[in-house]
Amino acid sequence: MSEAEIKDKVYDIIVSKMGVNKDQIKPESKFSDDLGADSLDTVELIMELENEFGVQIPDEDAEKISTVQQAIDYIVKK
């Protein structure tokens, strides 16, 4: 899967889980500050990314993922 395909899927997951418009999402968008996620939203988002991409994201790594681009980069590396 290409990085562009991963980006599109990540954006789609954010739209469905967080109820934001796709045009509100930017690579530098922070889940909490820019997209209005609380800690539970972030946990659910990480779980959905794990399910969608078949990766395990340990808690210590999940804590470091705070922006859209960090999520994309993490998945690309896996």
Curated annotation (Swiss-Prot):
Species per Swiss-Prot/TrEMBL record: Chlorobium limicola (strain DSM 245 / NBRC 103803 / 6330)
Principal subcellular localization: cytoplasm
Disulfide bonds: none
Protein origin, superkingdom: Bacteria
Pfam family, one: PP-binding
Pathway participation: Lipid metabolism; fatty acid biosynthesis
Compartment(s) where it occurs, according to its Swiss-Prot or TrEMBL record: Cytoplasm
Post-translational modification: 4'-phosphopantetheine is transferred from CoA to a specific serine of apo-ACP by AcpS. This modification is essential for activity because fatty acids are bound in thioester linkage to the sulfhydryl of the prosthetic group.
One biological process term in Gene Ontology: lipid A biosynthetic process
Cellular compartments per GO CC: cytosol; membrane
KW Cytoplasm (keyword) present: yes
Modified residues (O-(pantetheine 4'-phosphoryl)serine): 39
Keyword DNA repair: no
Protein name: Acyl carrier protein
PROSITE patterns: CARRIER, PHOSPHOPANTETHEINE
Residue ranges of domain Carrier in the record: 4-78
Function (record text): Carrier of the growing fatty acid chain in fatty acid biosynthesis.
Gene3D superfamilies from the UniProt entry: ACP-like
Keywords for the protein's UniProt record, in alphabetical order: Cytoplasm, Fatty acid biosynthesis, Fatty acid metabolism, Lipid biosynthesis, Lipid metabolism, Phosphopantetheine, Phosphoprotein
GO terms of molecular function: acyl binding; acyl carrier activity
UniProt similarity note: Belongs to the acyl carrier protein (ACP) family.
